[in-house]
Amino acid sequence: MTKKQREGQGAQQIGEIMGDLLAQAQIKAALPPPKRQTKKITPTGLILTERDQKLIEASAEIATTPPGGEDMAFTHAVLCQVGLPRAKVEGREFMRQSGAAWVNVQAGYLDEGHGPVLQPIPYGVMPRLGLAWVSTFAVRNKEREIPIGDSAAEFLRLMGMESDGRRYTTLRKQMHALAAARLQLGFKGRTYNGQPVQQFDAWVANKDTQQRALWPGVMLLSEDYYGSLIESAVPLDNRALHALKGSALALDVYAWLAHRLHRIEGRGVTLHWKSLREQFAQEYKGKDPDKD
């Protein structure tokens, strides 16, 4: 190969490389910009996600700023000790027990416009936040009739959640389940037995006219549940509920701590792993539930 041929081949290779680089640059220019890195590394090397940072900021605000009037929330004392299921339950009944407290939830029927429809057992974040908001209004205003907003979007906002199609579906499903559920709450010889919700107009859409589903607007608590709630309400902080809304387990741990710390006087209390497992891990089953 002559010198001239070698130079020509080298120029061709350089041209191919430049062409490849140009093509790659054009492809990258057409792609959306990379997402902003939301992770943060602390001086000790701990990696914090964006959610971790928000939780730390919320906890700092709660620790340094006393709750205002709108920050105060309430829930039933027994539900602080034994909450609703955190994941979907197969079947029509759910039982949870911890120490002297226990809860039994039974699925019920709700008329959705064309006769009775069996509802699932309420589970997850949505019924926890919904029940806390309803209980808060009842305790603050000494009222059994609870206004739950003029729309589903407003009720989601009241619970500190953004409104989107997926949340609308979850809200409808879980509010129907909660309204239909039969609840038994027991503690040291006393049992509440009934339905927390006495009346709830189902969130029904008119499929024939394609109208948007009508939001019921009002929920009526049963007299027995209302009386039990007023007698044993536990104060919570709405800011904490909103910060922890991404996890049913986190909400359960917070409500449990709020209830326990509210009662502790003088000497501290030693908590053993066995009691914590009984409190929060009854739903973990399988080959190695302790590890899970």
List where the protein language model places each region.
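Charged, alpha-helix-forming regions
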Residues: 2-292
